[in-house]
Each structure stands twice: as structure tokens, then as C-alpha cells.
């Protein structure tokens, strides 16, 4: 992929981080190798500029949860749509979260830092019963 479009440049930056490209047809295989993982789904940065911020935010977010052996997969524009369809995701950027090979949920869009941490905590930490 050349750097002809904003997404091409973003794609190259994500590859430079060592993140794994994944397709909808290979996602299940990837999850067997990376049971604690996130999959970054994107859209055209010209249409949705916050897509360019998502890799930075997610990279930092994963450091806040060191009890997991996080792996990161990335999907190109076409595969983002296919994977998004599979998981009912229609708002991008989106990050699918898996722990122990199980789908835990999705982080859609960009959020303030404290809110993002709380959203992720709700996905990955065991639910504790609360007294009513």
C-alpha cells in the first residue's frame, strides 16, 4: 500500500507498530493465537477524522490493563466493513475487545480518557455484584 491516501498513511503507521493485518475470514484463526486481543476497525479518515486518533488512544489504553497479554489486529477499509457487519458495528472507528478468546464488546468512536478507561474496564474486568 502506498501513501496515496490518508488511510494508506494511517495503515503504514499501524503496521510500523507491529500490529497484525486481519481479514474477516482469518479473524477466528487470529483469535486462537491472540486470545487477549483488540481489532481496530477503521473508515476513511477524510470522512471520519477521529479514525487517525484511534490507534494512539488504543495503544495507550492497553497499557492501563497489564494483566492481559494484548495483541492488536488491524483491518483495512474493506475488511473493517466486513468484520463490523459480523459484530453489528456501524460506527467507526471501532475497537473490538476479546479476552480469553471471547468477544467482550466494542468501543465505538473517541472518548475522553477517563471515560475510555471506564468503558474498557466494564468490558474486561469481571462483573462484581453490587448491593442494591
UniProtKB/Swiss-Prot annotation:
Domain of life the protein comes from: Bacteria
Family: Belongs to the HupG/HyaE family.
SUPFAM superfamilies attached to this UniProt entry: Thioredoxin-like (SSF52833)
Function: Not known. Could form, along with HyaD, a complex involved in the processing of the hydrogenase 1 structural operon.
Organism of provenance: Escherichia coli (strain K12)
GO MF annotation terms: signal sequence binding
One Pfam family in the UniProt entry: HyaE
Protein name: Hydrogenase-1 operon protein HyaE
Gene3D superfamilies from the UniProt entry: Glutaredoxin
Listed NCBIfam families: PRK11509.1 (NF008563)
Amino acid at each position: 500500500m502506498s501513501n496515496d491516501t490518508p488511510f494508506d498513511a494511517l495503515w503504514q503507521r499501524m503496521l510500523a507498530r507491529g500490529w497484525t493485518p486481519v481479514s474477516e475470514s482469518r479473524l477466528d484463526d487470529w483469535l486462537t493465537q491472540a486470545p487477549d486481543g483488540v481489532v481496530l476497525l477503521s473508515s476513511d479518515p477524510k470522512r471520519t477524522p477521529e479514525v487517525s486518533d484511534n490507534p494512539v488512544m488504543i495503544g495507550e489504553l492497553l497499557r492501563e490493563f497489564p494483566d492481559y497479554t494484548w495483541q492488536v489486529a488491524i483491518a483495512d477499509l474493506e475488511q473493517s466493513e466486513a468484520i463490523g457487519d459480523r459484530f453489528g458495528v456501524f460506527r467507526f472507528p471501532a475497537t473490538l475487545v476479546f479476552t480469553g478468546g471471547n468477544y467482550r464488546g466494542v468501543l465505538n468512536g473517541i472518548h475522553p480518557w477517563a471515560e475510555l478507561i471506564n468503558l474498557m474496564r466494564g468490558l474486561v474486568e469481571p462483573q462484581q455484584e453490587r448491593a442494591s
